[in-house]
Curated annotation (Swiss-Prot):
Required for the intracellular transport of organelles and vesicles, and is essential for the photoreceptor's outer segments formation, maintenance and function. Its main location: cytoplasm. One of its GO terms (cellular component) is cytoplasm. GO terms for molecular function: zinc ion binding. This is Double zinc ribbon and ankyrin repeat-containing protein 1. A zinc finger (DZANK-type) spans 210-270, 338-386. Residues 448-469, 600-614 have a biased composition (Basic and acidic residues). Residues 448-471, 536-614 are annotated as: Disordered. It comes from the Eukaryota. The gene is dzank1. It is found in: Cytoplasm, Cytoskeleton, Microtubule organizing center, Centrosome; Cytoplasm, Cytoskeleton, Cilium basal body. Disruption phenotype: Morpholino knockdown of the protein results in small eyes and severe pericardial edema at 4 dpf. In addition, dzank1 morphants show impaired ambulatory activity. Morphants display dysmorphic photoreceptor outer segment (OS). Retrograde melanosome transport is severely impaired in dzank1 morphants.
Length: 752
């Protein structure tokens, strides 16, 4: 036996082994002891061969007994099964032992005495007298005269019941035992049945419950299926039809005579009428379809007539999916609120679709759409055909109200049409609306699933995100440039957070693209200088290149005046320094001045150079300079903008780029205050392409310079016929559009 297990009980008969008999052969007076070697256990046993059970199963007899003292077995072949159970619920193995119990000599004497008492009682009952013992009357019962050899193995009554009821009940028990013995003799075929067989017989003979789910039988006597599980229920014994009405007549199937149906037999041929009145649910006439062309009857399973082969017209019927019945459409659109959650449901709803509670109003019966039978309002299956009853579909309140209004409108229109004579060829139609998209409410499971997916996505993003570099005292060097940059950024951030003056200075300027970086290294320090383009503020984008260079110089002075650990350094404070330190500072100052002198040109100057006579007017280069902060309206040394310089130098491809970047196409410049179109017209045929592009960019032809000349006047003076025709065409098109717009406005005023 393993550790912690409960020892199986032992079944031992308490007797001296008689010679010539086996161990399992005992008599009815031999006590049988059941014990287990494990302490603090209780023993359960059965005498009908079934397994001992700790809890009683519903629908089965309680045959499990608790062992308290040695028991005596009844006469016959007895199967004793025992099991030990500990306090904490651990169970032992089930032990089975079979005994062949024979009646003892004392039992035979008691049985003979009871037989004599039975004969006396029978005589008394025949004479019509009552047997009175200890003042108690026992009603007369008719007993059968059974020979002693058939009743010598009858079971006796309870042995220990007299001790519990007291000494005064011995006479009553004697009379009851005699009655029970006589009844046992009559019901002898059920004596040797096991508990399982008795339960099966009880289940088969219990007509008030369903044999599958043990639910109550439908109250309708003609219901053939269970309302809860849909299983077929056995018919009630002696089922009868409801009583016929007075004067109801029917046709007798034997003599073909109309006879009254309220009689048991036919008054003519005396054949029974009960069998003829039984409903024949299994018999069904074959469906037929009549052909509209030739009038031939056709079977229901074909689609074309067997005679003329024309297509048969079938009647529309509800589509039923297998063993499910569609809900019957309700004509009432009333809604009822739930008493628990205040959810608005249909008036014919059996349960609330939110909380599942039953409605507080009185529910009517449920009607099956397949066979038309009425069932219990909370039935799951039809009692007539056994199909599953689907619930009514959920429809919004607005749709119901709209349908009610449409029905009322259709009713009113139908009444009007009924009074008026129908016109020939008028087709009656009505508009119908339906809802195709409904509201969606996610369930609790779907909400949990979404939150879990969101958390998993966040954790995955956290794992993929680059970790911030740790702030260390010394960088690795040796070519690890990524770690070097991380070291520089981390120390620069830490220094900026701890130094308020440097933090204020670094937060002021608007930095552009980094243009250069210089590193100087000696045995003591590593100097790093980084130069950025100073982006001008929004209000001063048209500043000159000289102002930009001065801002860059001032910014470099501000940044160089603040160094790590030397914020207030001056020549007076460094008098006592060593020679090496003075030499190092001189070297650093010399390097700084060289860098300042070798600063690159500004973006505006590079833009003017690109559109100037030395430049090539490349569109990508101009776009890059504009993206890096160059001003499209910047002025050159002669006071002319970049747009005019592009026209004069023949770079007409960059004109749309400058105009798109907010360059003024009508900006006047130069000594005569000419615009870009003036300069293009003065070039003659060489500036034809520039004139065409400027006119496409909405350059003004009526703009005058200081001499009062327009671009058209300058083109006339230059003698370029192509430029004149182009300007005339553009001017005429503008006048035509302006005149057309004026006419359209006047026409609208006239008709208004």
């Amino acid at each position: 036996m393993t550790a912690g297990s409960v020892a199986a009980p032992q079944i031992i008969p308490i007797r001296i082994p008689p010679p010539g008999k086996a161990k399992h052969e005992i008599d009815s007076s031999t006590p049988v002891e059941i014990k287990s070697e494990s302490p603090d256990v209780r023993v359960l046993y059965t005498l009908d061969g079934s397994k001992p059970e700790l809890t009683k199963r519903p629908g089965f007899a309680d045959s499990t007994l608790k062992y308290t003292e040695p028991v005596r077995l009844p006469v016959g072949k007895v199967y004793v099964k025992a099991m030990a159970i500990s306090i904490d619920g651990r169970q032992s193995a089930v032990v089975t032992k079979v005994f062949v119990v024979e009646p003892s000599a004392s039992d035979e004497r008691e049985l003979n005495a009871h037989d004599e008492d039975d004969s006396v009682k029978n005589d008394t009952a025949i004479d019509g007298k009552d047997v009175v013992e200890n003042g108690t009357g026992v009603s007369s019962v008719k007993y059968l005269d059974i020979s002693s050899n058939e009743a010598h193995r009858a079971l006796k009554g309870p042995r220990f019941l007299s001790q519990r009821l007291g000494p005064g009940s011995s006479a009553r028990l004697t009379a009851q035992n005699s009655q029970n013995q006589s009844a046992d003799v009559v019901e002898s075929p059920l004596k040797n049945l096991t508990n399982t067989q008795i339960s099966r017989i009880q289940r088969e003979t219990d007509f008030l419950r369903c044999p599958k789910c043990l639910s109550h039988r439908p109250s309708d006597p003609f219901a053939r299926f269970c309302l809860h599980c849909g299983a077929p229920v056995p018919p009630i014994p002696g089922q009868r039809l409801p009583p016929t009405e007075g004067g109801q007549m029917g046709l007798c199937m034997h003599c073909k005579t109309m006879v009254p149906l309220n009689t048991a037999i036919c008054v003519v041929c005396e054949s029974p009428l009960d069998q003829q009145l039984q409903p024949q649910a299994t018999l069904r006439l074959q469906d037929k379809f009549i052909c509209h062309s030739c009038g031939t009857g056709n079977p229901a399973h074909i689609t074309h007539c067997v005679t003329c082969e024309s297509q048969l017209l079938r009647q529309a019927r509800p589509v039923l999916s297998g063993q499910r019945a569609a809900p019957v459409p309700s004509s009432q659109g009333k809604m009822v609120s739930c008493s628990k959650c205040n959810r608005v449901n249909h008036s014919d709803a059996r349960f609330c679709d939110w909380c599942g509670a039953k409605p507080g109003h009185k529910a009517s019966s449920v009607k099956c759409s397949q066979c038309g039978a009425s069932s219990h309002p909370y039935a799951n299956h039809c009692g007539g055909c056994g199909v599953f009853l689907d619930g009514p579909p959920r429809m919004p309140l607005q749709v119901n109200q709209r349908q009610d209004a449409e029905e009322m409108q259709q009713t009113a229109s139908a009444a009007e049409l009924a009074t008026a004579p129908p016109s020939v060829g008028l087709r009656m139609c009505a508009d119908a609306q339906t809802q195709t998209v409904g509201l969606f409410f996610p369930s609790n499971t779907e909400l949990k699933k979404r939150s879990q997916q969101r958390e998993a996505e966040l954790s995955r993003q956290e794992q993929m995100r680059d970790r911030k570099p740790l702030l260390t005292a010394i960088s690795p060097g040796r070519g690890f440039w990524r770690k070097q940059l991380d070291h520089i950024c981390a120390h620069l951030r830490s220094y900026t957070q701890n130094n308020t003056e440097f933090r204020a200075l670094i937060g002021e300027p608007r930095l552009g693209r980094m243009i250069s970086a210089v590193i100087q290294e000696d045995s003591y320090e590593v100097s790093l200088r980084i130069n950025f383009i100073s982006a001008p503020p929004e209000e001063s984008r048209s500043s000159s290149a000289g102002q930009r260079s001065r801002s860059v110089t001032s910014e470099s002075q501000n940044l160089s005046s603040v160094t790590e650990g030397r914020n207030s350094a001056s020549p007076e404070n460094n008098i006592n320094t060593t020679g090496s330190e003075v030499k190092k500072k001189k070297k650093k100052k010399i390097g700084t001045s060289d860098v300042t002198e070798n600063q690159p040109e500004s973006k505006d100057s590079l833009l003017l150079k690109e559109v100037g006579p030395e430049g090539r007017g490349r569109i990508p280069a101009v776009q890059q300079l504009l993206d890096e902060g160059a001003d499209p309206a910047c002025l050159g040394k002669d006071g002319r903008p970049a747009l005019v310089a592009a026209v004069l130098n023949g770079h007409h491809d960059v004109i749309p780029v400058l105009v798109q970047r907010e360059a003024d196409v009508n900006q006047a410049s130069g000594p005569l205050k000419n615009t870009a179109l003036h300069e293009a017209a003065a070039l003659g045929d060489e500036g034809l392409k520039s004139v065409e592009i400027l006119l496409g960019c909405n350059a003004s032809i009526r703009k005058q310079n200081d001499r009062g000349q327009t671009p058209y006047d300058i083109a006339v003076a230059a003698g370029s016929s192509s430029v004149l025709s182009l300007m005339a065409a553009h001017l005429g098109q503008g006048l035509l559009l302006r005149h057309t717009k004026a006419r359209s406005l006047s026409g609208l005023d006239t008709f208004s």
